[in-house]
């Protein structure tokens, strides 16, 4: 009875007068990305490929739970979310399937997709050091590890340990430096907090610009939003900030990057259409749209970036396979708790 009721509900959610025609090509999407960051591409996809779409947006954890509950009755063909750790969680939950697609494998670097091809990165975001140009001499900055130096006591703004972006950063450091060294670093970081972690990356950047802290760890696209904001006070705040790329020395690992990404769901009924969508999302045109609209870095080598991203300069990115962010996530969360990172 439960499955029958669920099936009726799902049909009601997705059905339209034309959606039940067998001749229609359609792809059903569950997306944790905001509608504004996916809908324009879907409209272009429909126009170019002649494939209709049905889009459901929501919180990542809620959509993942929904896929688990729906099981084989799920209408979803594609799951889109942010953070490689979340994508790995979807894989571990058994709601995705492995896809051997030569176009995706050729377009997306191996480090930015699942080792077993359950999910694929669609755009990159760099989590780096952003500092107040008036209070910080950039020559004193060097690495993520250096932020634990007592010289920065009372000067660091950062999000809470609940932030999946911080969890993934710590997960990457565990892979490189090991648990013991990373925990020592996290304790040093906590001792340098300018204030208890609060708010999102935009709040941190505004606080840094206002002098409440000197440095912040944030995703670069948040700075891009301030730079291009329609609000004059936000544009003014951005003028006080600059990007520093850590861990750039020869032999060092580079800047921590993460992805937004997608996978084909385990019970997808429209696999051909789902793959067509994923292939479309890694065309140069789609990649450049993400770069321009949300200031995210392309995953496809050679795709153009926005003027805003170009103004941040070039950097060497960490090349570890992002699958490890999900694998190390439970360890990272426990480590952050032990270190007092709330």
Regions found by a protein language model. Name each.
Residues 23-88, 342:
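Early extracytoplasmic/lumenal segment of secretory-pathway proteins
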Residues 30-33, 96-105, 115, 119-120, 131-133, 139, 145, 232-256, ...:
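Short beta-strand->loop
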Residues 87-95, 113-142, 170-171, 257-263:
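Periplasmic solute-binding protein
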Residues 161, 168, 172, 177-246:
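Ligand-binding pocket segment of bilobal, Venus flytrap-like solute-binding proteins
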Residues 260-319:
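Mature extracytoplasmic/periplasmic domains
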Residues 306-342:
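Extracellular/periplasmic bilobal clamshell ligand-binding domains
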